[in-house]
Amino acid sequence: APFITVFMYLNEARNEQEKKDLAMIIEETLRQRYEGVKNEKGVWITPAFPKLIYVLEEDNVREGTPYWYLTRLAAQCTAKRMVPDYISEKKMLELKVDKNGEGHCYTCMGCRSFLTPYVDPETNKPKYYGRFNQGVITINLVDVALSSGRDYDKFWKIFDERLELCHQGLLCRHERLKGTLSDAAPILWQYGALARLPKGEPIDKLLYGGYSTISLGYAGLYECVKYMTGKSHTDEEAKPFALKVMQHMNDACKGWKAMHNIDFSLYGTPLESTTYKFAKCLQNRFGMIPGITDKSYITNSYHVHVSEPIDAFTKLQFESEFQQLSPGGAISYVEVPNMQQNIDAVLELMQFIYDNIMYAELNTKSDYCQCCGYDGEIEIREDDGKLVWVCPNCGNTDQAKMNVARRTCGYIGTQYWNQGRT
C-alpha cells in the first residue's frame, strides 16, 4: 500500500472559492473511505492507506459553522473505518510557533513525525512542505530504569550515557547522508519534491539549520516510571518524575542542536513491531518483573497503559501535557467500541480534541468473517499460550478467511501482527 498521508485542511485555501472547491474534494475523499475498498471476495473492507488527517478548525468544529457537514461525515467515517485522524488547528497554532512569533498548522510525515517550525532565511517565510527527516533512533526508557536498580542517581547517570549513545547513533545517520549528490534521486533533490538543487550538487546544506530534522525517539515511559516510583505516571505523585524524564530528553536535543546546527527533536516512537523485540530483550536481561516486563510489549511513547481504567476525555487531557513535550511528533489514541450508532458521542470527542490536544485519533473495530458474514468484532482468545483470532459467531480461526483491521501503534494494520502487538 502507498505510504501516504492525505491532509484535509480548509484553511490552507487561499480564497473562499478555493475553500469551497477543497471542501468538495474532502467530502468525496471521506465518502470513498467510508465505503471502503472491495476485496477479492467482493467485501467492502477497511484499507490501511492512505492515512487521512482532518483538521478541526473554527469553520467546521461546531454545529452551525459552514463546514459542519464535513465534520459530521468525518465522524461517521471514523466510526466505521478508524480514519480520519484529527489535528486541532487551535492547539497547533499555540504549539508550533516560528521565530517570527507566528503559529502554524501543518501535516505530519507518516503517522506522527512532525517537522519543527522553520522560516526560510532567503524569503523570511515559513516552509513545511518539501522538508524531511534524517532518521530516528529510539531510547528504551524501561531498560534505563531497570539498569539503575531504582537508584535515582544511577538512573540519571545511565540515562545520560544512553542518550549519548543515541546522539552518536544519530550523527552516524547524519554522516551517511552527507555527500549524497542530488543525482541520487532527482525527483527528490532536483525536481522539487524536497529541493531544487543543480545536478551534481551535494544535499549537505539541507541537513543543517532546521531545513530537515533528526529525531530522538523514546518508548516505555509508563514502565520506566512504574518501576522507579511504584506508581503509574497518571498518579499525581509519579507524574513530576515522568515530566522530568521528558524534559531531560528535550534538553539533550536542545544541547545537540546548539552543538551541531542540526535540528534534533524529541519523538514519541510508534514502536510498531519493535515493541515485541524490546519486551523480549528486557525479559532476557532482567527476567519477569510483574507489571514491568511480564508482557510481550512495552507501552508506546508516553501513553497511558492499556490496562489502566481511564475514560477517553481524561486520557486525552492527561496525555496532552506529554504531547507538548514531543515536538518531533506524537499522537494520542482512545479505544472505543463500535460507535456507528452513536455519532454524537464521536463528535463530542472531536470537539474535546479541538479544545485540548493537538493530535489524536479514535480506535474502533472494523472486521468481517468470510465464513459466516459476521461484521462485528473478531475476538482474540488465548489458546495454549498463543493468542488467536476467533469469529464469535461461527468459531472460524482461519486468518485467510477473515478481515481484521486494527491500529495498535500508529497505522491501521490488516495483515495480522506478531504476538506482542496482538
Regions found by a protein language model. Name each.
Residues 81-82, 217-220, 328-330, 406-410, ...:
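Glycine-centered flexibility motif
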Residues 1-210, 231, 235-393, 397, ...:
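Conserved catalytic cores of very large enzyme subunits
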Residues 141, 146, 218, 230, ...:
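Generic structural "secondary-structure junction" signal
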Residues 214-227, 247, 407:
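Contiguous, well-ordered alpha-helical segments that form the cores/surfaces of helical PPI scaffolds
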